[in-house]
Amino acid sequence: MTPIQNAQQIFNRQHKNLPEITVYAPGRVNIIGEHTDYNDGFVMPCAINFGTAVSGTKRDDHIWNVYAADLDETDEFSLNVEIPKSEHKWANYVRGVVKFIQERYPDFQQGANLVISGNVPLSSGLSSSAALEVAVGKFCQQLGDLPLSHTDIALNGQKAENQFVGANCGNMDQLISALGQENHLLMIDCRSLETTPTPVPQDVAVIIVNSNVPHDLVTGEYNTRRQQCEEAAKFFDVKALRDVSVEQFQKREAELTALSPLAAKRARHVVTENQRVLDAVEALKNNDLTCLGKLMEASHDSMRDDFEITVPQIDYLVELVQLVIGKSGGARMTGGGFGGCIVALAPHDKVDAVRKIIADNYEKTTGLKETFYVCTASQGVRVI
């Protein structure tokens, strides 16, 4: 059963009527451009065919009653008083989104009964949190007939995650969940918010393999990496590392390394990764999978050696995939790091061989069982 069907059926069962509003927002996978978004840089994700559905109906008071079907937990809060934090982590994503929409539209106090259901694997690096934030934001927009664009909804979700949940994420995850296009990757300029759709070549599959090494960005090293990048930007006297070219970095690399070796390594990753995204757009335009594969490999090496966010299980998965696909595609870690998933672009006729080499070796070597997905690039948030 899809998240949409599940949310609607459970709502009907609980409330004895059909929901007036159902919205759906997808998760995402980032093909290239990691930890560049909060440095005002470039990313190239696509929305995927896994996501989060929210079904609900207006109430005649100010109360939100929210049931998270997949967790079997309920949260309730009022919109006519200051919205406090919940002890349920998932509920804070919902509360944060509503709180910041209220800041923008103080008259928005419409109560609602909601059911949430999703199939984005939690803590996998595929943006279950952004899908939830964007779905709830779109639900609010429909509920209150608010003049919010999909970009507004995305940035409101980011604000909720930064300021209410406490994860200092960039804006990529929410933007792609809101703005994704079917069968396209979306190159996003995280400063101007300009998007450039790039078709996924027809003969290419988007493969995601979850290492099932759990990660938690709120308590992890994510915020430390962000501080190190800000330190490097200050050294170059720029607003963000986006403003430093590869040549400019190389000229002063030794100087920064002497001052702060870690900041230099982090900056080297971000500066070179931004260039790799721009090069990847050109490679895709030319249908040059060999070039794209090299860029993805260089991205992974940079995350492993300079940004230091991969783990041995992830590195091993990438090695296995590269053995099979050779020069006909690429593989790299995707997401915030410290576990989560790898992404690979490979010809459809290599998918079974990729699946087999991982099934034969990964669990035997690591003691963990992978989860294997073949995804399609999908449309962003929508009303059902």
Swiss-Prot record:
Q: Which residues form a coiled coil?
A: none
Q: Where is this chain primarily localised? A: cytoplasm
State a single Gene Ontology molecular function: ATP binding
> Would I find tRNA processing among this entry's keywords?
no
InterPro entries, per database record:
Galactokinase, Galactokinase_bac, Galactokinase_CS, GalKase_N, GHMP_kinase_C_dom, GHMP_kinase_C_sf, GHMP_kinase_N_dom, GHMP_knse_ATP-bd_CS
Q: Where in the cell is it found?
A: Cytoplasm
What are the residue positions of the site described as Transition state stabilizer?
R28
Q: Which residues bind substrate?
A: E34, H35, T36, D37, Y222
Q: Which domain of life is it from?
A: Bacteria
Q: Where along the chain is the active site annotated?
A: D173
Pfam families, per this entry? Answer: GalKase_gal_bdg, GHMP_kinases_C, GHMP_kinases_N
Entry GO terms, CC: cytosol
- Which pathway does the database say it acts in? Carbohydrate metabolism; galactose metabolism
Q: Which UniProt keywords apply?
A: ATP-binding, Carbohydrate metabolism, Cytoplasm, Galactose metabolism, Kinase, Magnesium, Metal-binding, Nucleotide-binding, Transferase
Reactions accelerated catalytically:
alpha-D-galactose + ATP = alpha-D-galactose 1-phosphate + ADP + H(+)
Q: Which BP terms does GO give this entry?
A: galactose metabolic process
In this chain, Mg(2+) is annotated as bound at: S129, E161
PROSITE patterns found in the cross-reference section:
GALACTOKINASE (PS00106), GHMP_KINASES_ATP (PS00627)
Enzyme type, top EC level: transferase
User: Where along the chain is ATP bound?
Assistant: S123, S124, G125, L126, S127, S128, S129
Q: Which PANTHER family match?
A: GALACTOKINASE-RELATED, MEVALONATE KINASE/GALACTOKINASE
Q: Which family does it belong to?
A: Belongs to the GHMP kinase family. GalK subfamily.
Q: What does this protein do?
A: Catalyzes the transfer of the gamma-phosphate of ATP to D-galactose to form alpha-D-galactose-1-phosphate (Gal-1-P).
What protein name applies here? Galactokinase
Organism listed in the record = Haemophilus influenzae (strain PittGG)
